[in-house]
Amino acid sequence: MDSAIDISSDSDVEIQETRTRPQHPPRIAEGSHRRDLSTLRPHFLSGSSSGANGHTKTGLTNLDSRNGFESKPLPRAEHHTHIPGNGSIVTSRIPNISVGDYEKFSSQQAFKRTHPPTFSRPPFPPRPDIGTSNGNASHFRGGAHDDLGMGRVTNGTRILPPSVAHGTSASPSHFNGLSDPMHRNGIGEERNSENDERLIYQAALQELNQPKSEVDLPAGLLSVPLMKHQKIALAWMFQKETNSLHCMGGILADDQGLGKTVSTIALILKQMHEAKLKSKNSGNQEAEALDLDADDESENAFEKPESKASNGSGVNGDSGIKKAKGEEASTSTRKFNRKRPAAGTLIVCPASVVRQWARELDEKVTDEAKLSVLIYHGGNRTKDPIELAKYDVVMTTYAIVSNEVPKQPLVDDDENDEKNSEKYGLASGFSINKKRKNVVGTTKKSKKKKGNNNAGDSSDPDSGTLAKVGWFRVVLDEAQTIKNHRTQVARACCGLRAKRRWCLSGTPIQNTIDDLYSYFRFLKYDPYAVYKSFCHQIKGPISRNSLQGYKKLQAVLRAIMLRRTKGTLLDGQPIINLPPKTINLSQVDFSVEERSFYVKLESDSRSQFKAYAAAGTLNQNYANILLMLLRLRQACDHPQLVKRYNSDSVGKVSEEAVKKLPKEDLVSLLSRLESSPICCVCHDPPEDPVVTLCGHIFCYQCVSDYITGDEDTCPAPRCREQLAHDVVFSKSTLRSCVADDLGCSSSEDNSHDKSVFQNGEFSSSKIKAVLDILQSLSNQGTSNSTQNGQMASSSQQPNDDDDDDDDDVTIVEKTSLKSTPSNGGPIKTIIFSQWTGMLDLVELSLIENSIEFRRLDGTMSLIARDRAVKEFSNDPDVKVMIMSLKAGNLGLNMIAACHVILLDLWWNPTTEDQAIDRAHRIGQTRPVTVTRITIKNTVEDRILALQEEKRKMVASAFGEDHGGSSATRLTVDDLKYLFMV
């Protein structure tokens, strides 16, 4: 066996073992003459140049400028290498090396990622026998038809570029990695952004239309057949993983309910099947080399061996999915990765859908192809990275990733004002100049941890198990979770080490174009993974010329994103046949008492806003302004939500613990709660606000995910204090203790407990509208009649673009509950609200009217949520599910329901769309009716208009609308509009 030779001049460790015969450098056969290889430049790199066949090609310079790409001349090569005995001069940026080393060097370094996947390839004669010495094999030989020799690979490890490794002949343009800096050369020099953009633009030109190539899995892998659009997704994803220059992975942005989960499972099975075939076909010719796809240049390559599943069952205690049997990684893998074991696929998803992923992997994969699966969740999860690396698929939550993986640093040019304005959805003119002081409870241990923030350092003692393995693939489900690149969870996800990276999201843009930067950074999509380049190349053109800027963004996205909506056509037919979805906008009116209350509240809020504007303190009071908006929105649901109704959810444990705190701490914590802060999780003014012992403010529902879950550390930035019920306090609890210490009465705080609503005060115009709908549905279910239950008509003509371009969606002016064709199942309804206080009021109304229901919100444990979903789906007597929009809009499959009611409006219409698609998705057999209940002549009218602006912005970014730019954030003008100033 030849000794290992290190030929890398940067931080790569590139090693090749030849067990059967030496590997020869690539050969270029030539009949009667030799050519200067420096002239073999791709035709698109200049205005006109000679191609491989001698014909003149017209450049794309003008097209570049029209689409916002900078058309700068490419720099010429800097080094020249003479190949003895050949007479050819190879122009290259590769440093001069000895002739003896060149043979080994050329096969590994000179061809590292040398061409984009979409280059057209002219037909060539059959490739010579691989590995056969023919003539002077140590030198290049040019010819009219060029070809390459290559070494065989094992376990899917690539030695040469993808097209070569997969047996495809290469055109002369492929060799320009030797002469052009546009290609990644493995010598530590990055590509110029202009060159990167040329490649991206070239790829976009090749993919102007939706992909149509299909790939199916071999029989016996999936228990369900792939639909046509899923076969197309599989072909596209597999191509991106094996033959992509830009990044190994991408964004699958199909609409909710189109089966992104199944497409991803198919990709996992496809790759593992291909790896097994390569292993069998390699025979005894085994050449181990650095995998050129490893995304981290400073780390050794890691390759996940083929499936290690064995007979058995269980997913971390759950039956039905096979466990790994504990095999060790291959010798070569261990040799290259003494520090970082090679693992399989990591799926990161919200806690509410972890078990749904497990069910999909169990039900959709056949017993013969069963994957070894681990749910990495719970206090008893393994701490051994070698154990973690035994599984084909590992599923975990964003909270665990945020806690275990060292965070990538913030981008360099984040100004304080910009950070806060982007964080809270405000324009860049807003700022906050308040410093947060650490109140109580910060221990020396936690301070030490906070200072230890070496991004990506797996040797960091604070790094968890997830950071101590090298993943073959990382999949972010509901990837919009990382849309804010400044959050801990986004920076932690970017710190994961992986060779392939995927973002799954039906709504990749929710607030601003900046949402995309976080995906680009995670995917390592150069040059846009650098924030300065992202701003210069994408945000700048959009701000200067929205029409051309959005066209460029579409081209940038086309290279890495596949997006289909439910209205997309394939061969003239809908991409999927779903029952129709009807969206009703029902505008009801206040009662006299409610209108009087709202008018007074709106007048006071408008006066306060004008006072801030007159004093020039809008920026400093942005939290108070958002709080005033919150109160106006809540007043549209129920006046009692504004009148400080507090369920005091923190309970007795908190009440006992707060009595033990010093008085100065009580006063400090209460002062924080009363200063109108922002929730550290959802970045909105908190509903049912609570404060932790470490001094951070949350909605009780938001922080409950951490208290009741397994990640019991504070989610606030740079804080790792432990959370429990006895360190979370509500305003009423703190006021009560402070009043007791001061000898004051706290009766004011207790004047709005639940007993108030049990005396008939829990109803409101919206709740009455909900009961009318449910009564109408109950009558339909009992009599199977075809009569329609009518509600109040809408006074607003819906906009034609008010939905997401779904061809099967009808938007009507009046809320009419059309009868659903009976298929033997009961008619069930989901009721969404943003506020748990409103869910409490709806719950009391349902109880009073003897309507069987289940509830799902963020304060419930995962087990309780799962039980509620199962009972709603399977129990025919349970007709209603009341759900928090925060907890129920992601990932859940609720096709048992065919009616959806939205009680209040969210700033982002995509969040509402996600909630609706819990019911309108694959598997639904009945028409789905959606009712959005709003109040006439209130702030909700203006929110509807702002939602429409956001829809236009998203449509412009994706090329789904030919309109121009739209406002993308809450600007000062937006706020003036909302307050009618």
UniProtKB/Swiss-Prot annotation:
Binding locations of ATP: D254, D255, Q256, G257, L258, G259, K260, T261
One Pfam family here: zf-C3HC4
GO MF term list: ATP binding; DNA binding; helicase activity; hydrolase activity; zinc ion binding
BP GO terms, sorted: gene silencing by siRNA-directed DNA methylation
Compositionally biased spans, kind Pro residues: 119-128
Ranges of compositional bias, category Acidic residues: 799-808
Residue stretches making up the Helicase ATP-binding domain: 241-526
Enzyme nomenclature, EC number: 3.6.4.-
Zinc finger (RING-type): 679-718
Taxonomy, superkingdom: Eukaryota
Residue span(s) of domain Helicase C-terminal: 804-976
Region (Disordered): 1-66, 112-194, 293-337, 439-462, 779-808
Start-end of Polar residues biased regions: 46-65, 166-176, 779-798
First-listed, main subcellular location of the protein, grouped into a coarse class: nucleus
Class of the enzyme per the UniProt entry, highest EC level: hydrolase
Keyword vocabulary terms for this entry: ATP-binding, Chromatin regulator, DNA-binding, Helicase, Hydrolase, Metal-binding, Nucleotide-binding, Nucleus, RNA-mediated gene silencing, Transcription, Transcription regulation, Zinc, Zinc-finger
Basic and acidic residues bias: start-end ranges: 181-194
Compartment list: Nucleus
GO cellular component, one term: nucleus
Listed Basic residues bias regions: 439-451
Family: Belongs to the SNF2/RAD54 helicase family. RAD16 subfamily.
Quaternary structure annotation from Swiss-Prot or TrEMBL: Interacts with SUVR2.
Record's function text: Probable helicase-like transcription factor involved in transcriptional gene silencing. Associates with SUVR2 and contributes to transcriptional gene silencing at RNA-directed DNA methylation (RdDM) target loci but also at RdDM-independent target loci. May be involved in nucleosome positioning to form ordered nucleosome arrays on chromatin. Associates with SUVR2 and functions redundantly with FRG1. Required for the efficient methylation of a broad range of RdDM target loci.
Protein's recorded name: Helicase-like transcription factor CHR28
Organism from which the protein derives: Arabidopsis thaliana (Mouse-ear cress)
Gene this chain is encoded by: CHR28
